[in-house]
Amino acid sequence: MVVKISKMTQAQAFKILKSGCNVFLTGSAGTGKTFLLNKFIAYLRKKKINIGVTASTGIAATHIDGRTIHSWSGMGIKDKLTDKEIEQLLRKDKLQTRIKETQVLIIDEISMLDASRLDLLDSICKFAKGSFLPFGKMQIIMCGDFFQLPPVDSKNENPAFAYESSAWKNADIKTCYLDKQYRQNDRGFIGILNNIRNNQAGEDTLMKLKARLHQAIKLKTINPIKLYTH
């Protein structure tokens, strides 16, 4: 499958989000993905549009004042359910009503949700809304960076990525790639970070990093940051 990636500004991406199409909002760290997502959420709430604000993890959900997609959809830790099991699941108090009334579903940190669970979510939404269209015809906005955090599945060491799911392929996803960096203004350092992110760090990148090793810090006002793996 060939995916057309359009690099754009936040303003351009915001216009696409408001158009009603299904969107994958992505970009490297510091390009304002979560900022734009929160702006879109505020816009939808102002318009009185029913939205589901979710993320693949609890920590990510707190950044957008939402809940986990596992909780919102009722799937919990399951990665597969039969049609009968989905029907039974939707008998839970308020679950079917919540999904049925949702017009826009937002999932942040989509990279950590594996393909099987995105397919399951698609099935649950279709059942709840009584529609065979992708995600029951609701607009779906997925945000994240597949270069950062991989999907997590305790049963599978190499779970498939969300974009490998049937649900993703059938949803006619528009990819919005934010490329303006707001967290850094050092173009050289941004280049190094992007090379590492894209697995393109060659000898030139390595030499630039090695040049910083054991370099004396002359300014007494600088308190160097120390990073540890544990």
Language-model features, listed with the residues they occupy:
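Conserved ATP-binding/catalytic motifs of P-loop helicase motor domains
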Residues: 1-230
